[in-house]
């Protein structure tokens, strides 16, 4: 994404009333689809279920402002508007979470459904909903009735992704909203995919060399003791369905529009701000494409006012501003999913598993799959003491090893109530009180009021008797079992630190050796390092905060130069370059010279940024491909997948690990070392650039390699092929390590894989403190004028002010409104 033209950064009270009827027609022409499927922007319409009239206005982004005389009517209207804007997203996520996507998509989705039935988010959602207060259940019920009012009124005018599938949606239930929350929680915990990938890597290289592929953080020791758990096990032949399970988990990640565990948020204390008032910033990241699962909403009702971030299907504001308190969330990268290897004995359809020296019958229950175009399929799901056995096929697991997934249970969990209470909190102190009750999801919550800032880690973290949770543990040995959960009083927090700021960017947020285990799946440290650089550089304001959110400078480039110049590397690397054949020698020298002069700015138009990223990509191949390849192999795909979710061996080897066995190219008779492989990588970067960008190296541009592809992320649209839901591609800057995140798959390709979907800033010095923008559009319906209208403002950094004071509504939302009246 391009850096913003900062002269356009100032919040604009755009005239939202600009010809909505024309925009509806334009949306139809530009986006495809039937305008009759789009909610009207004006007029008066009766809606059965309302008690009094409700007004809905929209700003230029398409963000709705719901004004009502009762909170009941506000929730009902929110359900109606969410469905009108995002019904395809809501239905797709519900089917995915239920393990019923094949009812819409056919047999191609059956394997994902089978995995999701084993994961059993339905039980998690049931526990959460049952534990909620009667008040919260009423809220969810009213919201569901609003969704259903839309489904009834538009039953013959559903958007293209739903209508073309032939799927007939069921009405929304209150429990379905808890299911969407459970899917979000499941998606933010990346350990299932990481542990599957780690096991695939173990199959390829064995337990002895595995730890080198599982670094946890730059200053942490490699997990050799963790890898020792797998020694003596015949992983190649005994683990049931491992290759298929890993493939299905990757497919699930691709389908799940919530399935990226990345985000950034920070707060600036009054002593660090130019105005003497606090600031809060939030970058919420998701799979790149159309549309971001996040969307904006504003509600004004008696005794309740809030603007912020929502997910269609869930009547909660997850990050936002209520006039007194701003709050935001990012992924703490918490590890609360563990796989266990279970010894399995099968006798007919009966399954037993080994537990502390005894064979124990596995519990079981039946699941029925109603596959589109086929007959119903009944299968058995088996469970051990750790959880359900993950099965990739219709037949019960055979003798050998199978994988069971253990996750926390949510009985007596008050997280749903806590999120609602947080949206009403008047200050940071009250925000701490309510957020400590959020146990069902692992988050970095950052808060600010005008005078204070705070950070609180939420979630439920298992106490492991042994092991780090990086790899599946032997389930037959109780020494690896969970022993309850960490006391929430041990969860990290901070308030008004002396440094004057707080930040979370998926990095390790606790000191090495902290007293409880939050995770060993931390993200890369560079984004947090860059926040620290900028936050410490002087007084902050809205302008500097916008610049931070669009910053494309990586701190990794400077680390790379330090490595090149290290006393033990400088001379050997020069010798290794000199030893290359002449053509490669010249390329390597050019690459080295340019990288040493590179300033780390990854702008889309930069030639040196292109070379830098080519080097990162080629170095991964030069280091690992000889042992993990080819690039289509499960092991290589596992390496790439893990690098997209947490700190990677690709980065770890470049900055250190000089004694790693992977520096040797096993396909040559001689033994290579790190300088030799780095020299090859430098030359290969130029060779690859010549092939991809041409021989004029000064004309190279990072954005010609690295592009934002505006393709649909909706599970329904993906299953239908995408076509009319897509909007082409555009050059992008940045990468996984920049604050303006634009991560690609390290070892696979250059296209953007993860990017921010929504940005929010609250500057308490302003009359209207909240500004924001969304990356694509508020609506998931390609016939809507708000489907992709935000792409250009997003690329230019053109934030919109989001007014909370009633006298400013007309400036922000215009005069045009949709009026919903009580129907009969």
From Swiss-Prot:
Designated gene of the protein: quiP
Keyword annotations for this protein, in alphabetical order, are: Hydrolase, Periplasm, Quorum sensing, Signal, Zymogen
**Compartment(s) where it occurs, according to its Swiss-Prot or TrEMBL record:** Periplasm
Q: Which GO terms describe its molecular function?
A: hydrolase activity, acting on carbon-nitrogen (but not peptide) bonds, in linear amides
> What CDD domains does the record tag this protein with?
Ntn_PGA_like (cd03747)
Major localization listed first in the record, in broad terms = periplasm
According to UniProt, the name of this protein is Acyl-homoserine lactone acylase QuiP
Signal peptide position in this chain? Answer: 1-26
Instruction: State its Enzyme Commission number(s).
Output: 3.5.1.97
According to its UniProt entry, this protein's organism is Pseudomonas savastanoi pv. phaseolicola (strain 1448A / Race 6)
Single GO cellular component term: periplasmic space
